[in-house]
Amino acid sequence: VNCREMEARVWSDPQVLEILRNDYVIVALYSDDKKVLPESEWVTTDSGKVLKSLGKINSYYALKTFGVNAQPYYVLQGRDGKLLVPPRGYDLSIPGFVAFLRSGLEAYHNRQ
């Protein structure tokens, strides 16, 4: 619900949309997707549990990669997969989200 609210109330802002469309590649990991994947795409967790749905696999990936399974959780990464700036969670502040995106761009350009 919070992810959809962020998309509807923050991402829909013209300034945010322009930055997202022009300056970022968006990868969304939906944890509520119940689609069962083909067996060749199932994931076995460290504890031996087999994850079959896209949502469960996405949740596991987020937890293993970022140490967090909170939704929404925005991560800005460079091409090397390293964080550009600290991640951001649920916050409906449009100016805050714009600043977050711009800080990621600045960090990216400073690394080049």
PLM-predicted stretches and their roles:
Residues A8-S12, T45-L54, Y61-R111:
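Non-catalytic, surface beta->alpha helical segment in thiol-disulfide oxidoreductase systems
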